[in-house]
């Protein structure tokens, strides 16, 4: 009896967004049915850019554990400059497959509630924000301290050193 591996890939590329959508739909459909052992995302660009999206597809399907960042889509209640905060947290977590769900939310009104399933997170407010762990507020901090406090808490929870 032979054991064969089935490689899931779409041998088409395109701009980043197009490639990610095509690959997510195509490969995700196969993997969700239990079809496939390895995956490849095809992007017109450096092959290194294919790794993170492939891991994310596997995480979304529950086939791989690791760091998951959730953030709000922003609305009129967003009181902080959210995108740089998301970028800083994402960069600090690069290369770490820590099984934590981390939230970076734009407002303290909805943030902690919408991210109640997160292990740890921050939610912005006017010049200050909240640090929360598993839905419970653990600190109210000045806005400029939020990301570092979040990264400190991640390091404490995971017992690792992040890329700062």
What are these regions, as identified by a protein language model?
Residues 17-32:
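Conserved alpha/beta-domain cores
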Residues 33-47, 124-137:
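Glycine-rich phosphate-binding active-site loops on the catalytic face of alpha/beta enzymes
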């Amino acid at each position: 009896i032979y054991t064969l591996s089935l490689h899931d890939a779409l041998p088409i590329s395109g701009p980043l967004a197009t490639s990610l959508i095509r690959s997510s739909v195509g490969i995700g459909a196969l993997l969700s049915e239990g079809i496939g052992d390895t995956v490849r995302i095809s992007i017109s660009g450096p092959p290194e850019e294919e790794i993170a999206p492939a891991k994310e597809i596997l995480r979304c399907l529950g086939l791989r554990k690791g760091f998951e960042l959730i953030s709000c889509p922003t609305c009129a209640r967003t009181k902080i400059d959210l995108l740089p905060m998301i970028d800083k947290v994402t960069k600090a977590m690069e290369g770490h497959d820590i099984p934590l769900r981390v939230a970076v939310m734009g407002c303290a009104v909805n943030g902690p509630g919408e991210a109640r399933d997160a292990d740890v997170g921050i939610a912005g407010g006017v010049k200050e924000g909240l640090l929360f762990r598993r839905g419970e507020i653990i600190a109210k901090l000045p806005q400029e301290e939020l990301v570092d406090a979040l990264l400190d808490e991640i390091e404490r929870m995971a017992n690792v050193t992040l890329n700062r």
